[in-house]
Amino acid sequence: MLIVRHRVNSKAELALTPKTLGVEIDLRSRNDQIILEHDPFKTGELFEDWLTSWDHYLLVLNIKEEGLEERVLEILKKFGISNYFFLDQSFPFMQKLIRQGNTRVAARASDLESVETPLESGASWCWLDSFSGNWEYLSTVVPRLNAAKISTCLVSPELQRADSDSELLRLQGIIQRDGLRIDAVCTKKPEKWL
């Protein structure tokens, strides 16, 4: 399972991240530039400047504003980056990319959201989340996604809930118990997944 480090929105954080890991970043616009920033109305580093330090395995692009995708794709092409996927897009923007032939997007399934969306959307990734802490749904969902050749990326529990250590152990137990094939996990705590 590939470990994706969550919210690596600065060159300093990128430098601290082993090159064997993937990274997730947040993208917004400022004037006519794409910046890395999770929260609105803040100043972040320029995406193109950040990419001059990129030499990692997988790039997960969390789009915080609709309509950035075309510009982001131009920048990725300029830097020769092809191992990526888009995350947290609205369904219409996700479908627009898919209709243009780019399936490097993630549709979400969770304990509250049906797996049918990722299965029928044309997305090549599924972002697997839990809003209640109930991860048992993975036992039926993951095999269906695997059979459909849709890559899977878990949202590690600490991204949703601060007190997550016992939940993390339960989640890891479910994965092991059921022999689930998960392709990646996005986490603030890579050491918990090694």
What residue spans do the PLM features occupy?
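Phosphate-group recognition and catalysis centered on beta-loop-alpha active-site segments
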Residues: 1-194
